[in-house]
């Protein structure tokens, strides 16, 4: 028993010296795991002999000592293999060679230079998870080691070795766990990467009169939008000049946005995608008689990053709209409202109807229809 206690003390003294040394050399970290293995073997032997204490140290169970010894052997052998490569000359910290980092994703690889990747599920900043993107991943291929760069895209975190790509974090699977929709936004520093779900919802159609394999869904959606587009009475209002209060005379070039009243924030929803009533037709005649030109628009409102991602996806179906604005906000809005706005313009009401029929707008983005009039 005393002999085992002396060996344990000697082993632990060597470990303390290595911790205090805080070396950056791989050979010292190999020694660290060698002494961890010795310590576990001493504990295992003592437990087999029925000894439960060695000095002031409590002897772990056989299973614990055995598992720790196996882990130490694995780490020592992998580090010795890594030492035979050119990566031996790189600085290595105790943390770089720890078992916790060895078993972190991607598992069974050495990793350095972690960066935080934020993933917002449902495009909600309050429903975000953080993952680690490694700038250097050391992968063992047969008897040698290869250093590759960790990468990120809309699908997840991955690395590529000899043309073979391995994803160690799949954002799609994570979205099923943490999200309610199949939308997510990836933020890496100043970069914003969007999920592919809504891209799939934006069919890159040929001219609309050509039948497409997905035409069944598009036809159904068209039927829905061809029907009267009803909104709650509190938010739906057709603008009629004959009932409006007198306005100041506009100069040429002034803008009148009938979709939104800038003073009150009330929204006026255009009904151009349905059969128009005589009042609306006469109203348009009044506008046109004054030399004005009305452009159908859709106003999108939501999280700024989510809107930017959606606008980027829309470039795949740019034939379904005319122009897209940058993100903007009302200056009179409450500071607590962090939503941004994007305005899309269309050459005709028919083009806007096609857009609504073929494009899936995420549930996290509100949209309103309207007319932009230039007098």
Curated annotation (Swiss-Prot):
Post-translational modification: Phosphorylated.
Molecular function via GO: DNA binding; DNA-binding transcription factor activity; nucleotide binding
Keyword tags: Activator, DNA replication, DNA-binding, Early protein, Host nucleus, Phosphoprotein, Repressor, Transcription, Transcription regulation
Region feature Transactivation domain, mapped onto this chain: 1-200
Localization per record: Host nucleus
Cellular-component GO terms for this entry: host cell nucleus
GO aspect biological process, one term: viral DNA genome replication
Disulfide bonds: none
Pfam families in alphabetical order: PPV_E2_C, PPV_E2_N
Family in the record: Belongs to the papillomaviridae E2 protein family.
Subunit details: Binds DNA as homodimer. Interacts with protein E1; this interaction greatly increases E1 DNA-binding activity. Interacts with protein L1; this interaction enhances E2-dependent replication and transcription activation. Interacts with protein L2; this interaction inhibits E2 transcriptional activity but not DNA replication function E2. Interacts with protein E7; this interaction inhibits E7 oncogenic activity. Interacts with host TAF1; this interaction modulates E2-dependent transcriptional regulation. Interacts with host BRD4; this interaction mediates E2 transcriptional activation function.
Job description of the protein: Plays a role in the initiation of viral DNA replication. A dimer of E2 interacts with a dimer of E1 in order to improve specificity of E1 DNA binding activity. Once the complex recognizes and binds DNA at specific sites, the E2 dimer is removed from DNA. E2 also regulates viral transcription through binding to the E2RE response element (5'-ACCNNNNNNGGT-3') present in multiple copies in the regulatory regions of the viral genome. Activates or represses transcription depending on E2RE's position with regards to proximal promoter elements including the TATA-box.
Name listed for the protein in its UniProt record: Regulatory protein E2
Organism of origin: Human papillomavirus 7
Lineage start: Viruses, Monodnaviria, Shotokuvirae, Cossaviricota, Papovaviricetes
